[in-house]
Amino acid sequence: MLRWLCLYSALCALTHGSSARSLEWFTALVRTEYTEPLTNSSVTGSTESGRYGDSSPKESVKGFVGYPRDPWQLEGCHPDTQYIVPGTSAAAAAGPDSEWTQPWIALVARGGCTFKEKVFNAANRGASAVVIYNEAKSGNATVSMSHLGTGNTVVIMVSYPKGMEIMEPLRRDIPVKMVITVGTRHVQEFISGQSVVFVAIAFITMMIISLAWLIFYYIQRFLYTGAQCGNQSNRKETKKAISQLQLHRVKKGEKGIDIDAENCAVCIENYKTKDLVRILPCKHIFHRLCIDPWLIEHRTCPMCKLDVIKALGFWVEPEETLDIHVPDSIAGSSLSIGTVSITQEESRSEGNNLPSSSTGSSLQQSNSVKDDAGETTALLDDPGNDNAAATHTQDSH
């Protein structure tokens, strides 16, 4: 996920660097001055309320302000537009043949034609600069103006309120002197529409890839969780089956196992007195603490690879541990049985034919263990029977 975000950021940066363009524009400081006839006082105003046109020279200019004579031609779109410059001698209209020779600035309204036409018409009448005031609905806003090919004529735009402020004394035939100077430089960066579409497509693509990756991730996680739950269920069944295996505690002096020679095949340590061992169906013996974790993970005997769980498939009932006392008649056997674990099912099936001591069953199990003595595994007995075994051996001689 982090790699995709880094790739997207790099892509956006590359797109921004290659497709972004910067727009440079300058504000105009507009200063006006006129004399109020009624009070004979000077009224001045200076605000950074103008904006230079894109193709206008960024220069300062000054002069008296003129405006279109015809109220229906305030936009200055007609080539024959006549301008009045208050304060001129004989109130002459500005034009090519006018006696007015000082620089003057045309004040026209926005709309009716292109900015370029307005500038051309005013320049043909001798204006050294053109001030265009915005529409009333735009309030105090100004916009960029494109007017290629207008030469050295300075062009600025002011807001509608500022235009009306300048127009008010002109309509009373009061000369207004204006000074335009360069204001603050502004740089505005923007991205083209094509770049925006490209970045949007790239972003959507990244989101789709990320969503697909998340869906894949959570599906895998769900499957893994389900498998874990299944494994836990199997582990519970395995533990339940392992609990049915016989347990025996090693006793000192037992002949079925040589404590000094025999060892657990899992931990490779010799059996010690009082060690608790588990007897598998294949008659192999291991430490309980060693073989139980092994069976939970592998289910097979470490030595003969017998599947212990399958071998215990017939042992479906919980185990019941019974103490079986070995009679003296079989005490001389090389292997003897101390405590043996049998299931409730076997106990019930043979309970009606055997006495409470279960002597016949113990004899059968003893013979079975003797047949497997060559595998060095045994069910061990109490050391108290050692003397009886020795006596039996002497009598046989």
Swiss-Prot record:
Signal sequence extent: 1-20
Family matches, as InterPro entries: PA_dom_sf, PA_domain, RNF149_RING-H2, Znf_RING, Znf_RING/FYVE/PHD
EC main group: transferase
Gene Ontology CC terms, in alphabetical order: membrane
This enzyme's EC code(s): 2.3.2.27
Highest taxon above the source species: Eukaryota
Primary residence: membrane
Pathway named in the protein's UniProt entry: Protein modification; protein ubiquitination
Transmembrane regions: 196-216
Annotated membrane topology: Single-pass membrane protein
Molecular function terms, GO-annotated: transferase activity; zinc ion binding
Glycosylation sites: 40, 140, 231
Function according to Swiss-Prot or TrEMBL: E3 ubiquitin-protein ligase. Ubiquitinates BRAF, inducing its proteasomal degradation.
Record's comment describing the protein's domains: The RING-type zinc finger domain mediates binding to an E2 ubiquitin-conjugating enzyme.
Protein name in the entry: E3 ubiquitin-protein ligase RNF149
Organism field: Xenopus laevis (African clawed frog)
Gene that this sequence comes from: rnf149
